Curated annotation (Swiss-Prot):
CDD domains associated with the record: PAZ_piwi_like, Piwi_piwi-like_Euk
PROSITE patterns associated with the record: PAZ, PIWI
Pfam families found in the cross-reference section: PAZ, Piwi, Piwi_N
Alphabetical list of SUPFAM superfamilies matching this protein: PAZ domain (SSF101690), Ribonuclease H-like (SSF53098)
Main location: nucleus
UniProt gene name: PIWIL4
Organism of this sequence: Homo sapiens
Subcellular location: Nucleus; Cytoplasm
Region (Disordered): 1-48
Keywords per UniProt: Cytoplasm, Developmental protein, Differentiation, Meiosis, Methylation, Nucleus, RNA-binding, RNA-mediated gene silencing, Spermatogenesis, Translation regulation
One term of GO molecular function: RNA endonuclease activity
A GO term from the CC aspect: piP-body
Induction pattern: Up-regulated in vitreous aspirates of patients with proliferative diabetic retinopathies (at protein level). Up-regulated after exposure to oxidative stress and VEGF in adult retinal pigment epithelial cell line (ARPE19 cells). Up-regulated in cervical cancer tissues.
The protein, known as: Piwi-like protein 4
An individual GO BP term: cell differentiation
Length: 852
């Protein structure tokens, strides 16, 4: 099937004149309209080209990708859907006060800055109509902005909706303009709404304003963030470039309008798509090249450095070459080769390369068909890192060394950004035109909750480092361990010696932990994935408790085929270890300890506990991600504790296709988890606290309207008597605010256990931040918690302290993790299924942490 046919098959309609090979009506570059206060005549701030005259000479815009007011400044409109959700007013116990009081107070500085504006500031929303109607959004904007009534006003316009910070004299204003063709266009501007500064629409406008401001600082928007290509950091040994930049946001925090910014980096490969395709062809051969190439490239994001724009590769058109022609807006035809020579003085060297196809998002209020951009692989640079690259330790170390910032370094970068905005004449003018001014950087008071004691079988340890008790795990007996009597080790001839050496170390380490490990049956296999699976099929019987595979390489097919068979087809706990990992003799004790911990858990063992004051409490972790092979399939991982000590778990993973289906499967899971709890405890839990991770922007409403009712329904149906009390907490590891302590005129990471529940939180939500990890180098990130439903009525102090306790119970690491253990377990489960298994694991493994 040709690229043209595939595009049609995927529902991307071509224009009528695009049926001939090489003739497409769509431009190679997207159209653009900037939301500046003089879009019709000025440059976009970083390309130096006129929107109307210069670009129209070629019939092609070289400016910003044409997204609308609602889309362009706010890359995803869903970002602001959550702002209209108010959950706190329904929670009586925190309606008046949601802050805790226990713990040691600590002064913190943040990456949040006050934005000052007049008390009577309002935003005026108008609707603009044109008679006769105009299809061109750019022409609509140009005609409207040519009038003196709007020339000196701060404004944002998407072709239909106009926002002004100053009210027009009349509710209905009528204007007229004449086009270059002499046609008279009548425009009617009608006032629709007067919006207070707290309106979600105003928040969108504020964010668009600051995105315009960063463009005035010669920064480029890629995705949601802005980057500075003039200050690249090179990693030549790995052919990578890093563009420094910022993620920014404007929002209300506890009734204050605040500007937040954090440092960001864009990873760019110094490798063109053509170079990638050439290398791939050499590896795979011509027979399966096109299929492999499409599989690896479609869906990736590329950067065209001649205009610093990013595009998604939606297809590859093998029938179109750079020597083919396309039709410009003025009706003339030009070859791609000649176009790039004329427009950018770029000479295309390979005239036989295929063309990449990118679907340009259809503009809001634009009635034209969705357009396709044809891009030349030779001029497109790959962005991001491949899975192979992320597994390259040396590469990731080199990237980390460039991007890791100390708290003081991060603070300096943020201070410089704010200073640049205030010093830049155009940026400052943009702010002042809208009536905005930068205020002070926010300082606040947090609290440090007490550290936890780790409960072992015959020992209570207070770790020297509160975040790590790895030394204690080697010398103390774990809570409970099942003996490993019948098990298999699969290895090749080449790795047999290292297997024997490792086995001796493993048995010594496990013995000191109280985990009895007998000698296994060692089976030698050939070094290919199919041989491992055949050996498993041959030797695994009902008595085998665990299968260990020592893999000769990190080739993904080894791990995937073994895990898929032993998780679904023949459910037996499995342990995969790379042979090269076992060759690190100086680290053998540490490696053996970690593997012994994992094996214990996979057999149903319990490693340690913390004191849980609440009796009869079930905690649940839920995570959702997309399947790596089928992007329309969502993998839902659910993990629930089944004993009061919160050391035993019930895990299940379900594959679904819609968010409604996700809500439905949560009821199925909760029913199974409650049955399991009843089986072990002969009663239902008095309290259930659900930690919901994997929540995207704009999904709070779905959680509240669909998921919470399903959870409540399963709880209510489980007992005819009194039902368990339920709380649901949304967990987000990625959040904009950062916190620092000031010591000796410098800033440092806050202490472990720091809680922030004021000033940087939302007034309409019951929320808090918790720092439950230690950053030896770099800057620590807080985790954000939003309690969206709460029947338990716990005091904020108790909810925060319980959450901190749960961060100690992740058995894959003898230390504290950044999220509660059930969340991390659910993440590990979904990752295994989404990346390797691609089907639901057998319920026979549900009582074990088989995915560690």
């Amino acid at each position: 099937m040709s690229g043209r046919a595939r595009v049609k098959a995927r529902g991307i309609a071509r224009s009528p004149s695009a049926t001939e090979v090489g003739r497409i009506q769509a431009s190679p570059l997207p159209r653009s309209v900037d939301l500046s206060n003089n879009e019709a005549s000025s440059s976009n701030g970083f390309l130096g080209t006129s929107r109307i005259s210069t670009n129209d000479k070629y019939g092609i815009s070289s400016g910003d990708a044409g997204s609308t007011f609602m889309e362009r400044g706010v890359k995803n409109k869903q970002d602001f859907m959550d702002l209209s959700i108010c959950t706190r007013e329904k929670l009586a116990h925190v309606r008046n006060c949601k802050t805790g009081s226990s713990g040691i107070p600590v002064k913190l500085v943040t990456n949040l800055f006050n934005l000052d504006f007049p008390q009577d500031w309002q935003l005026y929303q108008y609707h603009v109509t044109y008679i006769p109607d105009l299809a061109s959004r750019r022409l609509r904007i140009a005609l409207l902005y040519s009038h003196s009534e709007l020339s000196n006003k701060a404004k944002a316009f998407d072709g239909a909706i106009l926002f002004l910070s100053q009210k027009l004299e009349e509710k209905v204003t009528e204007l007229s303009s004449e086009t270059q063709r002499g046609e008279t266009i009548k425009m009617t501007i009608t006032l629709k709404r007067e919006l207070p500064s707290s309106s979600p629409v105003c928040i969108q406008v504020f964010n668009i304003i600051f995105r315009k401001i960063l463009k005035k600082l010669s920064m480029y928007q890629i995705g949601r963030n802005f980057y500075n290509p003039s200050e690249p950091m090179e990693i030549p040994q790995h052919k990578l470039s890093l563009w420094p930049g910022f993620a920014i946001s404007v929002s209300y925090f506890e009734r204050k309008l605040l500007f937040s910014a954090d440092v960001s980096y864009k990873v760019l490969r110094n490798e063109t798509v053509l170079e990638f395709m050439t290398a791939l062809c050499q590896r795979t051969g011509l027979s399966c090249f096109t299929q492999t190439c499409e599989k690896q490239l479609i869906g990736l994001i590329v950067l065209t450095r001649y205009n610093n724009r990013t595009y998604s590769i939606d297809d590859i058109d093998w029938s179109v070459k750079p020597t083919h022609t396309f039709q410009k807006r003025d009706g003339t035809e030009i070859t791609y080769v000649d176009y790039y020579k004329q427009q950018y003085d770029i000479t295309v060297s390979d005239l036989n390369q295929p063309m990449l196809v990118s679907l340009l998002k259809k503009k809001r209020n634009d009635n034209s068909e969705a357009q396709l951009a044809h891009l030349i692989p030779e001029l497109c640079f790959l962005t991001g890192l491949t899975d192979q690259a992320t597994s390259d330790f040396q590469l990731m170390k080199a990237v980390a060394e460039k991007t890791r910032l100390s708290p003081s370094g991060r603070q300096q970068r943020l201070a410089r950004l704010v200073d640049n905005i205030q010093r830049n004449t155009n940026a400052r003018f943009e702010l002042e035109t809208w009536g905005l001014h930068f205020g002070s950087q926010i300082s606040l008071t947090g609290r440090i909750v007490p550290s936890e004691k780790i409960l072992m079988q015959d020992h209570i340890c207070q770790p020297v480092s509160a975040a790590d008790w790895s030394k204690d795990i080697r010398t103390c007996k774990i809570l409970n361990a099942q003996s490993l009597n019948t098990w298999l080790i699969l290895c090749s001839d080449r790795t047999e010696y290292v297997a024997e050496s490792f086995l001796n170390c493993l048995r010594r380490v496990a013995g000191s932990m109280g985990f009895n490990v007998d000698y296994p049956k060692i089976i030698k296999v050939q070094e290919n994935p199919a041989a491992f699976v055949r050996a498993i099929q041959q030797y695994v019987d009902p008595d085998v408790q665990l299968v260990m595979c020592i893999l000769p390489s990190n080739q993904k097919t080894y791990y995937d085929s073994i895990k898929k068979y032993l998780s679904s087809d023949c459910p037996v706990p499995s342990q995969c270890v790379l042979a090269r990992t076992l060759n690190k003799q100086g680290m053998m004790m540490s490696i053996a300890t970690k593997i012994a911990m994992q094996m214990t858990c996979k057999l149903g063992g319990e490693l340690w506990a913390v004191e849980i004051p609440l009796k009869s409490l079930m905690v649940v972790g839920i995570d959702v991600c997309k399947d790596a092979l089928s992007k329309d399939v969502m993998v839902v991982g659910c993990v629930a504790s089944v004993n009061p000590r919160i050391t035993r778990w019930f895990s299940r993973c379900i594959l679904q296709r819609t968010m409604t289906d996700v809500a439905d499967c949560l009821k199925v899971f909760m029913t199974g988890a409650l049955n399991k709890w009843y089986k072990y405890n002969h009663d239902l839990p008095a309290r259930i606290i659900v930690y919901r991770a994997g929540v995207g922007d704009g999904q709070l409403k779905t959680l509240i309207e669909y998921e919470v009712p399903q959870l409540l329904s399963s709880v209510a149906e489980s007992s005819s008597n009194t039902s368990s009390r339920l709380s649901v907490i949304v967990v987000r590891k990625k959040c904009m605010p950062r916190f620092f302590t000031e010591m000796n005129r410098t800033v440092q990471n806050p202490p472990l256990g720091t809680v922030v529940d004021s000033e940087a939180t939302r007034n309409e939500w019951y929320d808090f931040y918790l720092i439950s990890q230690v950053a030896c180098r770099g800057t620590v990130s807080p985790t954000y918690y939003n309690v969206i439903y709460d029947d338990n009525g716990l005091k904020p102090d108790h909810m925060q302290r319980l959450t901190f306790k749960l961060c100690h119970l992740y058995y894959n690491w003898p230390g504290i993790v950044s999220v509660p253990a059930p969340c991390q377990y659910a993440h590990k489960l979904t990752f295994l299924v989404a990346q390797s298994i691609h089907k639901e694991p057998s319920l026979e493994l549900a009582n074990h942490l088989f995915y560690l």
